Amino acid sequence: MAGRRSSNVFPLSGNSGGGLEVDTPTWLSSQAATSRLMVRPSMGPGICPGPEVWGVPLGSSPYEFRGGIAPYRACEARAWSQSSSEDTCPGPYIALRYMPNLALPEDVSAIQKEMEQLAKELRQKRMTLGYSQADVGFAVGAMFGKVLSQTTICRFEAQQLSLANMWKLRPLLKMWLEEVDEKNLLGICRMEMILEQARKRRRASRERRIGSNLEKLFLQCPEPTPQQISYIAGRLRLQKDLVQVWFSNRSQMGSWPTNDTSRREDVGATGSPFPGPPVCFPMAPGLHFDFTHYEGSCLTPLYSSTPFPVRGALLSAPTTTLGLPRLSS
């Protein structure tokens, strides 16, 4: 199939070929501040339509732009010619897309209307597909190499950004809208895969933190009372049954093969999973206690840390390091 490749974009001679791994699209910015390139991996043969998109064959070598060399990672490159010649993308290739970085046009009123329409379209499409503003910002980063915060998407939809800033975000958000168009099933599937991977990473990270927090508490109190279990469950936002089963399974595993004294010292040094001021954790089973006014004996005070909201998630700690049982609600 025919494709387009810039006449001044070519592999440097003297370098061996090979695969080129590009995990996410990469922005190549111009020192002339007039334009930029977006590098997107793709599989060919394929068509790179229009004079603003060029197909570059995959290879281990960097590519040379007029006035400088630009590897496939983010870097600076000087301005280049927009002229292009017919060429072929024979196999896997990278699509280099020319992204103009233009100032605001003189017709401000027309731009305001366009931005209003784009903001409404973005909000409508996002809500129709059931995505949060944070989902959109993360997906834009995964797809096009520039992560947008939830606040940025929120202010764009509410048209609370300056016109200049909204104009700068316009190309990215329009590309995202094109990607998730109802006719573009591949783009929608790609969006779902990106968000699912992000959810898995967040869930795994949360599970590791919860397992670590429970392990710290276990080293301080291997056999907590029902009142203590209720307190732990409330602070970690877990079900009491899950906490009770975790402590029961952890007790059956026995002590760690390493020195227990060093483990306890590590727990004291790292602090507690609970937020708020220092709290005395009572150790004597069956004692009535009040965490804010308890005057009995206690071990190391528990100091603040970030709470972890968990709603029915699987609980586990890394089996390679903690060897903790995996629980489910």
From Swiss-Prot:
UniProt-annotated stretches for the region Disordered: 1-24
Main localization of the protein described in the UniProt heading: nucleus
One Pfam entry name: Pou
UniProt xrefs under CDD domains: homeodomain
Ranges of compositional bias, category Polar residues: 1-14
Coiled coil, from the record: none
Entries under SUPFAM superfamilies matching the protein: Homeodomain-like, lambda repressor-like DNA-binding domains
Protein name: POU domain, class 5, transcription factor 2
Organism listed in the record: Mus musculus
Protein's gene: Pou5f2
